[in-house]
Amino acid sequence: MGMEALRFLHVIFFFVLILHCHCGTSLSGSSDVKLLLGKIKSSLQGNSESLLLSSWNSSVPVCQWRGVKWVFSNGSPLQCSDLSSPQWTNTSLFNDSSLHLLSLQLPSANLTGSLPREIGEFSMLQSVFLNINSLSGSIPLELGYTSSLSDVDLSGNALAGVLPPSIWNLCDKLVSFKIHGNNLSGVLPEPALPNSTCGNLQVLDLGGNKFSGEFPEFITRFKGVKSLDLSSNVFEGLVPEGLGVLELESLNLSHNNFSGMLPDFGESKFGAESFEGNSPSLCGLPLKPCLGSSRLSPGAVAGLVIGLMSGAVVVASLLIGYLQNKKRKSSIESEDDLEEGDEEDEIGEKEGGEGKLVVFQGGENLTLDDVLNATGQVMEKTSYGTVYKAKLSDGGNIALRLLREGTCKDRSSCLPVIRQLGRIRHENLVPLRAFYQGKRGEKLLIYDYLPNISLHDLLHESKPRKPALNWARRHKIALGIARGLAYLHTGQEVPIIHGNIRSKNVLVDDFFFARLTEFGLDKIMVQAVADEIVSQAKSDGYKAPELHKMKKCNPRSDVYAFGILLLEILMGKKPGKSGRNGNEFVDLPSLVKAAVLEETTMEVFDLEAMKGIRSPMEEGLVHALKLAMGCCAPVTTVRPSMEEVVKQLEENRPRNRSALYSPTETRSDAETPF
């Protein structure tokens, strides 16, 4: 090789070396801090400014950036005390490639942007909590390339598109994956490795989306899963037997289109609510028994056929004897007679030329004449009827609810529900005393008349001599409502959903004892009217977010409405549409979230509730606020049951309850001790 050639090679080598050094310098100069500030912040924030993300700037120490945690390559966390050393100034940290993002936690942070593709570039990122925001767009493929990620919560956003298959790349580390309450759709992708078991995965929540297709059977290979939620999607077909093998502690398959026989879950605690809202053909414990089994083995089928053939002779002979005996009967019971018999809790029926009165416990003294001749005074009008205060001939009063024509289901569907409602007796529920149906189909529900004020008027109306509402009194009202709801949900063989919880449907007496009205009425209404009730709940601010899709109330939607009601009690603010033209909407949970972010939580409480309170924390106000926000969680499975709500309210009573026993004290009369 000549000298010129050697010189040429030396020059080439020199330039390659310079280029390599330049590239290395560039890479070392780019850090997770720069990436977060340059790409992630703008993408997540969107068009509206987030108070949390405002701390992400060069003038604020990196360790004080809100919603993030940092760690060095050696595993030691970044502490603010480190900034006392010159080597840990913001300038040096911005360029330090050994500083890594460990956790991104920004729930309820008013994020209106999208998930950036660059999120996959954080090599040591372990947790991403971006739930309860307004993020849109798709889940980037690159999220599945974050090799250290173990906890992901993207619930309660507006993410759309399909779930990228790369998500299952995280299987080795993933412990919890939640995307509940988005607009994701399509068939769930299977892991690339056919035998992938996602051994560490414990929580998988894909509910509240639009996923379709058959049950994703690969999930049955995830042996470590303890909590599985596929609710409120459009899955269909059979639920695989393999699901029964998993050691699940929580399961929700409700509001899909699953059919056939459920697998054997052994001695599980799953109730019917875990499977409600599917195809009527879905059967097996805890639902109705299956008429025939689609899972029988060939041997079992053969045995069943032989048994049926041998039993056919016996059945035929019994049937002949029964028919011969039937002919000898002198009278045949009508369908109505059969429908109205054998009701142990029903006191009796009183029939006349104008219709039929079915009376329940406490309504024994009512007669048809009493009901038809009572003089009425309109108390309230709703989309499905009118409530009257009716004066009886003996001077007593009853409350009559006349159901609007066309609102109620047919008699055969309506009467069993009416009878169930007539059996309910609880001190925090207004009892149904009787039911009247006229010859022309008119229907009346008859209740005790209670000359009490509604909670709505107590909180929001300015009336003379209205009692002061200190915290002790508000707590008693809230606890009474919770107890009534808990009884509806768990105190019956068949749970009752209230379906219309609002402050107008709570009556409060002079001693601040609360009673719920209008429970269970959606069950007797035709679907169009039931939908109207749900729409009104949205207008009034009590509608649970999942009802946008399924429009069928359930215990969890009752819990959500109770959470709004508890916030209304604590804050003294009316939820829902407001203003002269109803063009403003008051979202109570959002007001609380904003106050928490701005560190002004104490300002959300009604001043009247705060009177005399030295420590809202000790008096249970702050705990009640947290409980209310838990009830209002966008993800249904996060919400507590009403039994748990009652327990928490009982355990966190106001310390000074003396003001409960002064019912005559009013806002204008005296200073409340609270």
UniProtKB/Swiss-Prot annotation:
InterPro entries: Kinase-like_dom_sf, Leu-rich_rpt, LRR_dom_sf, LRR_N_plant-typ, PRK1-6/SRF4-like, Prot_kinase_dom, Ser-Thr/Tyr_kinase_cat_dom. Residues 373-674 form the Protein kinase domain. It is a single-pass type I membrane protein. One of its GO terms (molecular function) is ATP binding. The keyword Transmembrane helix applies. LRR repeats lie at residues 100-122, 124-146, 148-169, 173-194, 200-222, 224-244, 247-269. It is found in: Membrane. Residues 333-348 have a biased composition (Acidic residues). The keyword Kinase does not apply. Residues 1-25 form the signal peptide. PANTHER family: KINASE-LIKE PROTEIN TMKL1-RELATED, LEUCINE-RICH REPEAT RECEPTOR-LIKE PROTEIN KINASE PXC1. Belongs to the protein kinase superfamily. Does not seem to have conserved a kinase activity. This is Putative kinase-like protein TMKL1.
